Amino acid sequence: MENFLEKNKDNFAKIQVPLKIVRIKKSTLESDGFDFAAQIPIAANTQNAIKASDLSASVKYYQEFEKISRELTTSNGDYWFFERARGSYKAEEDKFIGQRKGKNIFRTKYPKEKMFDKTDLAVSALCWDLKPMSACKGAQLAFLEFNEGVKERIPDVKEVKELICKWLIFSTLERRLKEENRKNPRTIVNYSIYLFSKKYGNRIEWSEIWSLQKVPEEILYPLTELAKKLDQTIRRNMGNEMINMFARKDQCLELVDRAEISLDHPFETSRYIR
């Protein structure tokens, strides 16, 4: 500021700068579990476009999830990158700028396809937890619901691995449907994972999926076929509504539950399902 004033001799005396003062009650500051740092962006978020998930970067669950996930070596020798704070992947990547082959070194360790954020985690987890309607409400609302269930907990290695594997199946199915030019694949993926989890969620060999670090075709192919049938069923019955809006209604969930779509074969013969 001093340097600026030395170079600029204009009169700035009449310039007004808006200032927001947030007053926090002493009782609130002294209450158990109050995180002062986490409350600053929440109090300041009146005009800026800050997303709900951005305000939870300091929640201990996500801090520990990030720490564990960054330390888990995969069978491929690379790592998953959980983006606890928006833009952290690029920020970490930029640290390698200037180094010889720096960006390649970073992306070899943390491949772009193995980066996911808090909303990805939330939407996927809700579907596996049999809450597809919540997942279909949008990334931020889905995150708020997921956050309520985890913000007071600390994840362990087993939970982190399982949630990453769930995201791996979720995102791989979505990518497969996109490759086949399916419209609004996320909605169909939400309900496909819901149906799959409803029957097999507690029987999947997550340690096998983690070791493989990809979705085996014996699961991905029938899951893709399930998604196609589900897509047809929903579109035939949604009337004039947009599929992403219809998917938020009880009517859609009831329709999916009533749909006569067999899940027995070939899932029952897969070595990844016990």
Residue spans of the language-model regions?
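Accessory terminal alpha-helical modules
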Residues: 3-274
